[in-house]
Each structure stands twice: as C-alpha cells, then as structure tokens.
From Swiss-Prot:
Gene3D superfamilies, per database record: 3.30.465.10, UDP-N-acetylenolpyruvoylglucosamine reductase, C-terminal domain, Uridine Diphospho-n-acetylenolpyruvylglucosamine Reductase, domain 2
Family (UniProt): Belongs to the MurB family.
Entry keywords, A to Z: Cell cycle, Cell division, Cell shape, Cell wall biogenesis/degradation, Cytoplasm, FAD, Flavoprotein, NADP, Oxidoreductase, Peptidoglycan synthesis
Positions of disulphide bridges: none
Gene name of the encoded protein: murB
UniProt protein name: UDP-N-acetylenolpyruvoylglucosamine reductase
Record GO terms (molecular function): FAD binding; UDP-N-acetylmuramate dehydrogenase activity
Amino acid sequence: MTARKDSDWRDMLPRVQGRMSFDAPMAPFTWFRVGGNAEALFRPADLDDLIAVLEVLPPQVPVTVVGVGSNLLVRDGGVPGMVIRLAGPFATIDVMGDTITAGAGALDLTVARTAEEAGLAGLEFLSGVPGTIGGALRMNAGAFGAEMKDVTVSAQALDRAGNLQILGPEELGFSYRRSAVPEGWIFLSASLKGRPGKPADIGARMAEIARVREESQPVKVRTGGSTFANPEGHSAWKLIDAAGCRGLVMGGAQVSEKHCNFLLNTGDATAADIEDLGEEVRRRVLETSGIDLHWEIRRIGIRRDAS
C-alpha cells in the first residue's frame, strides 16, 4: 500500500505475543493469490493477545478478519487498517454429546471429519465448504442442501471494543449467505448441533460430496469459489452460461469452462482483472435476463486505480 498520512494508531499498539506485520503482503493468504498489502496484519497468539489490541485500537481504524482466503478477493491497492488472521489456538475443536464447539479458525473440512469420527450426522455439508468456521458464520455458508443456520446453536464473538458477546440464532440473524452480526466483530467459535449417526454412513455422504465437487467444480486451480449468490429461483451458473460468459477472459482472469460461477486466476491475473471480469459477467447477465447478480466472494481493500 501507499504510505499512510496518519500512523498514530500504530504507535498505540501494545507489544503482542503473536505476529504483527506492517505493509504485509496479502496475496499468499488468498486462494486467488492476488492483491496488495495489509496496512497491518495481526496473527494473535491467543484471546488475551487479541483483546489487548482491540482495546487500544481507535474505533476509526478498520478491522478486517480473514481465514484461509478461500472466498476472498483482496484488491490491488491493499487493505487499510488492521487485518486479523485467526489460526492455531483459534482452531480448536471439542465434542460434547451431540454438540461440536469449533474455533473460528478451524477448517470446515476438519470439523466435518471430527463429526464423522464422533458419529454425528448433519455436518457433512461442511466438507464441501472451503474455508473456516469464522467465515462460514459470517456468510451463513452452505452447500449440498444445508447451511450454517441449520446447525448453529450459538457463537462467541468479540465486538469492536474487545468485549465478549454470546450470540444465539436471533442475534446471528442468518439469511441466505449472510449473517446480521456487525462488520468488525470477530467470531471466536461456534457450537454446532449434530445428530447420532453411523460413521460409515457419514463418511459415505462426505465421499459423495467430494466426488460431486471434483466432477463439477474447478477445485485444483486458483479460484475464489462460488462468485455470485444464486438469485431466488435461479442458478447463477445457468444465468452466466446463458449470457455467453463461459470461458470469458479478461487479462489474466477467466470464467471457468467447468463451472461458470467460478472465476479463475490463470497465472498472471491482478485483482482488478478478476473483479472487472466479474462486473462484466454481471452486466451481461443483467442485459440478457434482467437479473442483477450479487457477489458472494468477499472483496476487501481499495483498487489501485481508485481516485
């Protein structure tokens, strides 16, 4: 990023136990492998470390939380403020009865496998959701006929001031690919409800999910997952295909030939290439169908060409 005009907030930060980096590259933390730098990137060692930073961070400083970057596009101009990446101690998974408590940094697939081992059905869909539990909560992630609102009993989060909040279904306010939790709040964990099942049956369902993903989606390339949310009563990919966008190229970005609701970095794309391609897809779909597609991929930061 370009140098900030006001660096006072950085001078206020406490000594941390985790890792604090400034002007830190973000591309390595996204599946697209594109984007600019974070003004500050913080990987806290534990909850106390995270709270200590939030308590002194001025409220005007943006806070952005990222996981493994599977459904994320970081713009080329970088991300102002504080980017927080949760891993390690925030990725624990515990089983008690028919409930799994998973840290926000836990991989969705790992949670699904833990449920399988514990003989808890109902969480198999998470094996088809690339990313972490924190991201799944934020966007009410779903796949293969289920979504987070179906299994989430409660969640823990920190508000912008570092206060612990316990969120039930009403506070979470799940809707299609959204939650009502304020931006800037940081999910810490989720309690997920399963139901008794046979590990063999659960494993077979997960294997079927993996097979379908492998056959229908570009899972071994630089992509950000499903690009656009499905409009009510429609499949985004069908609208995109009908608009003639399958295989469409812009710079180093391409609409996947295999599944046209996926955008690809073919090797040398910029974030602008990917975003501009997505906007061109939206324009063509609106022109041909009258339907306005909405981004499902989370776009953060500023464009390099922004005035």
